[in-house]
Amino acid sequence: MTQCYAEITGWGKCLPPATLSNHDLSTFLDTSDEWIQSRTGIEQRRISHVNTSDLATVAAQHAIACAGVSVEEIDLIIVATCSPDSLIPNIASRVQQNLGIPSAAAFDLNAACTGFLYGLETATRLMQASHYRHALVIGAERLSFYLDWTKRDTAVLFGDGAGAVVLSKTEQKVGLQDAQIGCDAQGRDILAVPKFGTAMDRFDADNGYWAFDFVGKEIFKRAVRGMGAAAQQVLARSGLSTEEIDVVIPHQANIRIIQTLCDLAGIAQDKAFVNIHRYGNTSAATVPIALCEALEQGKIKPHDDLLVAAFGAGLTWGAGHIRWGERITPLGKSDAQLPSCDHTALDLLSKAIEHCKRHQSE
């Protein structure tokens, strides 16, 4: 039986238009542009005026056009998200409905910030083992929904957005060649929204507020350790030296984590694609957005070897080796875009900010 692979043939992104700058944050938090940039590398982030599935749909439309396939050819949809519009049904079915895809398998996957890499591994192995020809893998988040806007440690970090890729079955040795994904469950409580779901008291009058637990120093240590070990395992199995890695697409959580990951892996920092300054941490969306922009900016060349690495709540972690194919430009383009937004980011967040302030004062 001929070995098959899953080539990335399409890529797309969706960033909501409303931008929340560090200066904007300083109008209601005890922080400053210098404080945020020096610790995270973030200058601004996007705040969505639409649901997560809307972001996912637009990113998917661009990826499908880029791949030059019709929606009828998509037979597998995986949406990686930890901020879905609804738990029942999944938002992959909403994306499928929005796109007019007739009967594809569609499901959500929650591995937090590592979700896209989990989804890429899952889709690739399903395509290799079964009949699927074209898969749509999306990372989409609206994390602004979760945040306590009185807590500086998390309010400055996260943003909203979506990225998507189309995978197409091929006999060429391209696409995700190897991946190492895992979870350090001993650290599951240091990055968590612990009472969102059936753990929540549904009759509590204060259901609009929930804790977002975040232990930054411990997260940093575990993130670097998990991603670094996974990257070393992937490189060893792929038979690649660090010099042979052309581009690193890391999870965009913190510029210091990206730099430390490269140092531990022995890879030059200038090989890492970085856009955290523009969007902050968009969780499962960071890797596909970064991949899309690396292609748009000409950072990825035909036949390049890419190292992808991520970590997230759980604490999930992972790394993967992607061998790029021949094509680095879109076959087609889509004019898909979000509905217009006449509000600033501060306008969109005004009720949430006031609610969080009231809760803190009680």
Swiss-Prot record:
One Pfam match: ACP_syn_III_C
Question: What InterPro entries does this protein map onto?
Answer: ACP_syn_III_C, ACP_syn_III_N, FabH, Thiolase-like
Q: Which stretches of sequence are listed as region ACP-binding? A: 252-256
Describe which pathway this protein belongs to, using the record's wording.
Lipid metabolism; fatty acid biosynthesis
User: Which GO annotations describe the biological process of this protein?
Assistant: fatty acid biosynthetic process
GO CC terms in record? cytoplasm
Identify which residues the record assigns to the active site: C113, H251, N281
Which keywords does this chain's UniProt record carry?
A: Acyltransferase, Cytoplasm, Fatty acid biosynthesis, Fatty acid metabolism, Lipid biosynthesis, Lipid metabolism, Multifunctional enzyme, Transferase
What Enzyme Commission number does this protein have?
2.3.1.180
Q: Where in the cell is it found?
A: Cytoplasm
User: Which molecular function terms from Gene Ontology are attached?
Assistant: 3-oxoacyl-[acyl-carrier-protein] synthase activity; beta-ketoacyl-acyl-carrier-protein synthase III activity
Q: Which residues cross the membrane?
A: none
Task: Give the main location.
Answer: cytoplasm
Q: Which chemical reaction does it catalyze?
A: malonyl-[ACP] + acetyl-CoA + H(+) = 3-oxobutanoyl-[ACP] + CO2 + CoA
UniProt superkingdom = Bacteria
Family annotation (HAMAP family): FabH (MF_01815)
Please describe the quaternary structure of this protein.
Homodimer.
Q: What is known of its domains?
A: The last Arg residue of the ACP-binding site is essential for the weak association between ACP/AcpP and FabH.
Function text: Catalyzes the condensation reaction of fatty acid synthesis by the addition to an acyl acceptor of two carbons from malonyl-ACP. Catalyzes the first condensation reaction which initiates fatty acid synthesis and may therefore play a role in governing the total rate of fatty acid production. Possesses both acetoacetyl-ACP synthase and acetyl transacylase activities. Its substrate specificity determines the biosynthesis of branched-chain and/or straight-chain of fatty acids.
The entry assigns this protein to a family as follows:
Belongs to the thiolase-like superfamily. FabH family.
Question: What is the protein name given in its UniProt record?
Answer: Beta-ketoacyl-[acyl-carrier-protein] synthase III 2
Q: From which organism does this entry originate?
A: Vibrio cholerae serotype O1 (strain ATCC 39315 / El Tor Inaba N16961)
